[in-house]
Regions:
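Bacterial N-terminal signal peptides that target proteins for export
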Residues: 1-12
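Residues embedded in well-ordered secondary-structure elements
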Residues: 37, 84, 130-134
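N-terminal signal peptide c-region/cleavage motif recognized by signal peptidases
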Residues: 20-22
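C-terminal/domain-edge helix-coil "capping" segments
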Residues: 25-41, 135-140, 146, 150-251, ...
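Amphipathic beta-strand/beta-sheet edge segments enriched in Tyr/Trp
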Residues: 90-173
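N-terminal segment of the mature soluble domain
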Residues: 38-106, 152-154, 281, 287-315
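Residue-level detection of beta-strand scaffold positions
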Residues: 48-51, 113, 147-149, 276
Length: 316
């Protein structure tokens, strides 16, 4: 418990605080982390080869930059090695990028007025169907990526990423974003997806507290609701108020859930799990408890992998 708690507390200072928006509702700010999807704990140095395809070089450069900037707990996650340098590397990322666009002529029908009411020029009294020549544009981006561990040649990660956008361009419609803009946005999204698969991430999220007063005595209801309101200005104070309530009343599902959030906010993941479990046993409604437990699991795995990685870094 101690190592997990200490590591989680460390995360409070290392999280991406820029992602936190001011809480407008009754929420508590939780700093957490997600592990890498791929098994990369022992891969400290990484190289990105040029991807195949016309856009492969630019895609690989963007991915290399994302991996070089990837951090966890305030430390760079990878040491990026240029593949042409000949320097030792632990992993090699390769892939393909294919972007294509296809346009086909299509005909759409429109109703056109051919005669207006002489007494009211805005009122149509006769319409006909006319053909409009349009173009149907289909833009496709097909990307594949693979990560190979140099030490044993094992494929640690492989994933296809496909995106498709279809629009119909007609002279009487406003123009949609250009195909170049679509390709650029898709490349950015795919690069970010790969980065999140290959490196852990820290983040902050505002989680809404449970406002239910069911099961509480009248005096406890008043104190509970006051703590809920306090979350807007003093989250620590709200948690202290809920904790004080447990000395006088049996925790309800809502109180247990909120105390789970408080402990998660403070980095005590074990205590948070206990409170969430209590809320779950008492029949807490909705998906909030399930989501909280899943978030705790991801955070624990991220912290565990980071501890193992630091050991590998020390051995190196």
């Amino acid at each position: 418990m101690g190592a997990v708690m200490i590591g989680a507390r460390w995360m409070l200072g290392a999280a991406l605080l820029s992602l936190v928006a001011p809480a407008n509702a009754e929420t508590l700010t939780i700093n957490s982390g997600d592990p890498a999807a791929a098994d990369v704990t022992d891969l400290l140095r990484i190289s990105v080869e040029r991807f195949e395809g016309e856009d492969g070089a630019a895609f690989a450069q963007a991915l290399e930059a994302e991996l070089a900037a990837a951090t966890f707990h305030g430390s760079r996650f990878y040491r990026v090695v240029a593949p042409e340098s000949g320097a030792p590397t632990d992993a090699l990322v390769t892939g393909t990028v294919r972007a294509s666009v296809d346009e086909t002529p299509v005909i759409e029908k429109r109703r056109r007025c051919t005669e207006y009411d002489p007494a009211d020029k805005k009122k149509c009294i006769k319409e006909i169907d006319v053909d409009i020549r349009c173009r149907r544009r289909a833009a496709v981006v097909a990307t594949t990526v693979r990560l190979v561990a140099i030490g044993d040649g094992s494929i640690r990660y492989t994933r296809p990423l496909n995106a498709r956008d279809q629009v119909t361009l007609c002279p009487d419609r406003s123009a949609p974003p250009s195909v170049e803009d679509y390709f650029a946005a898709t490349f950015r999204n795919q690069v970010r997806t790969i980065r999140d698969d290959l490196a852990p991430r820290s983040y902050a999220i505002d989680v809404r507290v449970d406002e239910s007063i069911k099961g509480l005595t009248k005096p406890a209801q008043t104190a509970f609701k006051a703590a809920v309101r306090l979350t807007k200005s003093d989250q620590t104070g709200a948690c202290a108020a809920w904790t004080a309530l447990t000395r006088d009343v049996e925790p309800t599902a809502a109180l247990a859930f909120n105390l789970g959030l408080c402990n998660e906010m403070e980095g005590d993941l074990d205590a948070a799990a206990d409170w969430y479990g209590d809320a779950q046993r008492q029949g807490a409604r909705g998906s909030a408890v399930t989501e909280a437990l899943a978030r705790l699991d991801r955070c624990r795995r991220a912290l565990g992998a980071w501890t193992a990685r630091k050991a590998a870094m020390g051995a190196e």
